[in-house]
Amino acid sequence: SSLCRMNGFDLGDKAHTAEADTSGMNRLMKLISKKNPELFKKCISLNDKKNVLSSIKDVDYFCHPETFFGRTRQFTSSYLCEHPVYKGYHLVFDLKHDPEAMFSEKSNEVLKKVLNGAPKKYRTIKANKNPFIQDKSFATNYGDEYTTLGHEILEQRANFIIENRKELANRVSLIISDQFE
C-alpha cells in the first residue's frame, strides 16, 4: 500500500484486503508499463520458467538481486549448472570470488569446505520464482565489491567459468549430491 500511496493512488482503509491489494498491484503494473516499458517487459518475460535458463546461461555474466535477513543485495554471477537434486534450480557462481583460484584446488573435500564456507561462493536461482535478471551493465552501478573489481575482471572470471563449465559443473554437482546422500 505504501508503494501505491507514493505513486499517487492511496488505497485508503481498504489497504491489505485482497480487493485493494489486487487493484493496487494492477495500477502499479500499468504505471510501470507506461513509464518504463522495457523494464516491464523484462519483468514479465521471466514469468515463464522456460525463459529463465537462456537468460542466465546464454550470457557470460548477469546481475540479480537476492534477499536474506530482510535485506536485498545485488549479485553478479555466471551460470554453472542445474542443481543436481532440485530440477529448475540453477547454480550460479558469485563473481566477487575468483573461480580460477578456488577451482585450482584439486581435492573435492577441500573445495567443498571452500564453496560452502562464508561468504557463499555460489547462489541458487529458482526458475519457477520469476527471478529478476539484469544485464551485466548493472554490475558496477552499486558502489560495491563488483564496482571495485570492474567489468574487465568480472569478464575474465566469467570466461574462466564458461571455458571450464563442464568440469566445474561436474565437481560442484558431485559435492552437492554428496550432501544429499
Residues covered by each model-derived region:
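Generic serine detector
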Residues: 1-2, 23, 33, 45, ...
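Acidic catalytic cores of enzymes that act on phosphate-bearing nucleotides/polynucleotides
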Residues: 43-125
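Acidic, Mg2+-coordinating catalytic module of metal-dependent nucleases/exonucleases
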Residues: 1-50
